[in-house]
């Protein structure tokens, strides 16, 4: 299921002399005046704010200059992610440029020490350093800062994370969230760059802005205001970087010119992160700061190998976690995916949680059990504050008279980490299912995936000029996304699968005389749908193939115009119906008398629409798309044929179910065609014992008429068999024409022949072979017997 949402309200007023379309795109990004537009579209280094407007900067600069002048021992205490690595590298180079002789980086082990300052490290570092300077951490380490002060250290805390109620009692504290600094969303390396700006001016900034750009993209902070300057200027300088390590890493990651945010976020950042995830991040600092070509090559090559190892490990954990979902998650009742695995790498489970959260659009907690404890990483969706929910779980558990739920936990609205006793993981699931639906700001419709678009454009406007216009918004990323556009009412001239295993969707889209190609990555299954007109969400892009440059639509989503559904092709539905009838016929006589009395409740169409409001838990069994369209009447649901492929139990119209693959995931199962198929409700009850079973009491008899038409006379079937004996083309359409039958009747007859061994017949893909002739009774076919028993009375035999 998918909803389209429009971002903001379009204005009819321009910003200065800018085109109306660009004016609206800028307004959606918080840009409202010509002056703001100039800064946004043409960011310059001179747009960086005065670093001394950040509270604590003057004191920090004074301490650093004294430490360098008096040659104190200095430790830069960082973090093991890309932001912490780059922030550490920036400060290390800055202090060395100032003349510091006794400065060292220290990055804690993710696996042995965890994030932030820790007492053991403080005790060690206090023996050799007089100044402790944190980057990308420390703002919540009140006890550890107090310990460092007690051990005689001078402490400067620089961080960008959320402020606690009380700040650490350091000698200087720098955080852009502290008022009155004008831009709040710098990353840790961005704060380090501001210190460099204060100490060395713009010359120092220009030498290190490449590292700040990499960290800004990797740490997913908004690409607005100062961050926009940092990323744009930093990427420009990467092309001529004097850093041997960065150059070698770019070479191994196949980063070509010009560098873009995708290169930073998806190619360079994972390789740097791999160091901290699997080994130590200090080697990454060495990579970014070394001037030795051989050392740079060795470290970059090693990190590239670690990243490949990390990818394999992540893939394995994701696959194992997804395979555990059926046993550990019930989408009918659960409000979070909570997966417990054994001995997974703690440095990779966060990536796995992110992948699963993105795939299922569900709050996700992936836990790895080590002995009696489980370490977990959480990722969430907009609308569910996972940190708030964990806090509520902790409070509820204590209110119930228990002890501590968590050994430790922390984070923010969309990501968190926790440690819990493994035996309490079932309790965590239970508590989440209580607190999430009761959350103050939780609208349960947030579980329905949404795609947001900014502007609606006609297909004729999707051209090179539009791409050039949108490119003015670069660099794009978090907070400044690549604009998503919508084109309505397009005709699908062609939809086919491409790529390995047909994973991707290749489209030809028309609007009058206007034709554009489209590509939908990981959407190959949409090629099998029946299309009328569609509304498409997309980003325009240039496709280069054999020297030709054309505009194509990078398709993010597609829905039927005027509704939320993409309806299956009628031939697909009939093929599945025939398989369903075959299964029903084979099982019909084995149903017990108790099963044959499975309780089913009447339901009217308007009552069904009320049940669909929550978006989850209703499975609608259908066999004819025209009636299903009437029932839904513009409502929201998924559609599938044979089996439901989405595990999340969104409201779904399932055509002709493969009963063996039906799962007990549903709150309600509704037979849209009424009780037309004897035995169907009984088999559904066996597969879905926890669901309430309904049938529409106002359903038409169209399905019964179709089934009656399929129940042809024995003379007609004999005529079909004689036609097979004559040979010639065996296509169903030709057989139908020669025998005066419909294709549906032919396919039904061939299925009957297959059951009595007159032919070898496969419906999908179509394969037909005559077998040696022998005497048979057609009623020995379970399908034939089922059709005659229930529908022959309405057929003129």
Where are the predicted features?
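Short alpha-helices
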Residues: 90, 168-218, 225, 411, ...
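Acidic, two-metal ion nucleic-acid-processing modules in DNA metabolism proteins
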Residues: 91, 228-270, 274-322, 358, ...
